């Protein structure tokens, strides 16, 4: 999912972030220079489903190796590295807390040997979940985008892709994955019951185990 920064696209997550986040871009912030292999764009397009799947597969492959080493674990632990997104440490921590409080079959945890990473910078495409040339999954958080929209919602939404959820553009504000559908007044950063149930269902059978089918 990509968060567009164009003023005409305020039908995006569209959440007044200035109050929630303030200025997040350090004066020395450099623009994002890496070229994603695929981007799960914010606005609906024919590329979104494939891009989201590519991102999820990258994470699943990394997690599958860990699950194979500990098949008896009651919950799958997905590890992330937030060191490349220091400006958003609070939002990432909130996203982790939200998801860990909402579901029980999968846990998000910061640590080494990460399954995916968070990054920050400037990008005209806004924020998005993607994969790099080596197939590793990452979430990119754009400075201007996270001033324009509610930063915790943006971060928690993007993290929802890690857990297997696609974008649902026509959904209401109560759906975390609804993207730009609800308009600028929506500040909800919590998954709804259907989203929680879907994540639980996916990971109850070990979403990571399904990675064997896409290797």
UniProtKB/Swiss-Prot annotation:
Residues reported in the UniProt entry to bind Ca(2+): 152
Keyword Zinc recorded: yes
EC number assigned by the record: 3.4.24.77
Record's signal peptide: 1-30
Cofactor(s) needed: Zn(2+)
Keywords recorded for this protein, A-Z: Disulfide bond, Hydrolase, Metal-binding, Metalloprotease, Protease, Secreted, Signal, Zinc, Zymogen
Cofactor note: Binds 1 zinc ion per subunit.
Pfam families xref list: Peptidase_M7
Localization, UniProt: Secreted
Protein family according to the UniProt entry: Belongs to the peptidase M7 family.
Name of the featured protein: Extracellular small neutral protease
């Amino acid at each position: 999912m990509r968060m567009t920064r164009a003023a005409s696209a305020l039908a995006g997550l569209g959440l007044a972030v200035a109050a929630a986040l303030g200025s997040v871009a350090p004066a020395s912030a450099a623009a994002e220079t890496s070229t994603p292999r695929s981007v799960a764009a914010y606005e609906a397009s024919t590329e979104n489903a494939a891009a989201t799947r590519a991102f999820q597969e990258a994470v699943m492959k990394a997690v599958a190796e860990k699950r194979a080493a500990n098949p008896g674990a009651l919950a799958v632990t997905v590890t992330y590295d937030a060191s490349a997104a220091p400006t958003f440490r609070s939002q990432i921590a909130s996203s982790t807390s939200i998801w860990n409080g909402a579901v029980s079959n999968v846990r998000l945890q910061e640590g080494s040997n990460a399954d995916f990473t968070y990054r920050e910078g400037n990008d005209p495409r806004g924020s998005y979940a993607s994969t790099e040339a080596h197939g590793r999954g990452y979430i990119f958080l754009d400075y201007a985008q996270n001033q324009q929209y509610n930063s915790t919602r943006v971060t928690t939404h993007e993290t929802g892709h890690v857990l297997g959820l696609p974008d649902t553009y026509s959904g209401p504000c109560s759906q975390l994955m609804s993207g730009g559908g609800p308009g600028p007044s929506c500040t909800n950063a919590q998954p709804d019951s259907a989203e929680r149930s879907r994540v639980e269902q996916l990971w109850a059978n070990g979403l990571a185990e399904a990675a064997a089918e896409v290797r």
